[in-house]
């Protein structure tokens, strides 16, 4: 939150506004703990994606994500325009290099990165379950085959 271009503009900050980042981290930690508690109490399955962490990683390691601009938006000056105020403003030539479309909203590329993280988060959990299920299935087949083999030896 503290790295949003509009926040940095309003706070006259060159760097991310740490207090808002701390609030986001604290909030997300509390959600993660509460979900853990609910999973245990209600025997439910949930997945949690800390979107703040995705933004933080993209801000700290822009090249890894293919960004060249993480401090301002593609629209207008990129520091104050939000939503409707972008209409009529000039935009950057290549939005895929930008993390933000305007001073608050991510670009389509950043939304795609977030979606891919969510799919991977859920997919990893499903893959693990599949691997466990598959391993148990193989163990059952081996056990069944061994029992048949042992039975055939006894019947001789």
What does each of the following model-derived ranges do?
Residues 117-125:
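C-terminal alpha-helix
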């Amino acid at each position: 939150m503290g790295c949003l271009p509009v926040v940095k503009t309003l706070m006259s900050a060159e760097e991310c506004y740490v207090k808002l980042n701390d609030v986001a981290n604290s909030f997300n930690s509390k959600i993660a703990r509460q979900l853990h508690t609910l999973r245990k109490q209600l025997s439910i399955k949930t997945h949690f994606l800390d979107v703040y962490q995705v933004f933080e990683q993209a801000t700290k390691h822009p090249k890894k994500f293919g960004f060249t601009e993480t401090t301002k938006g593609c629209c207008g000056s990129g520091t104050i325009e939000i939503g409707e105020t972008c209409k009529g403003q000039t935009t950057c030539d290549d939005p895929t290099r930008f993390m933000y479309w305007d001073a608050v909203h991510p670009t389509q590329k950043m939304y795609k990165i977030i979606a891919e993280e969510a799919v991977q988060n859920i997919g990893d959990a499903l893959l693990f379950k599949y691997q466990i299920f598959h391993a148990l299935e193989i163990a059952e087949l081996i056990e069944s085959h061994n029992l048949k083999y042992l039975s055939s030896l006894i019947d001789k």
